[in-house]
């Protein structure tokens, strides 16, 4: 149980840190979508059963969106994304089969706008 709490705490720290690093550029192509998803994920972290899978989907979404919009991250931003990737790797292939990583709606429930 303690291990899961550490992962949850780390995930919260890194998602918030990345959000704060990127929020100033939210009006640039792709950054707004990434910031929206980071905010959504940070809200869902406490209620999700599988933190690793959620973070894994987040990192995949960030990578696809960055590639599509030709976003170059700074060293600090990239370091945080790598730390999130380490957390996400613990999920293995859980939830990746036939997934659309570029779909932002995977982070929203049907009752949210």
UniProtKB/Swiss-Prot annotation:
Keyword Transcription on entry: no
Keyword field: Bacteriocin immunity, Plasmid
Function: Imparts immunity to leucocin-A to naturally sensitive host strains.
Signal peptide (residue range): none
GO BP of this protein: bacteriocin immunity
Protein name from the UniProt record: Probable leucocin-A immunity protein
Pfam families noted in UniProt: EntA_Immun
Family note: Belongs to the immunity protein EntA family.
The UniProt record lists the keyword Nucleotidyltransferase: no
Annotated Gene3D superfamilies: Ta0600-like (1.20.1440.50)
Highest taxon of the lineage: Bacteria
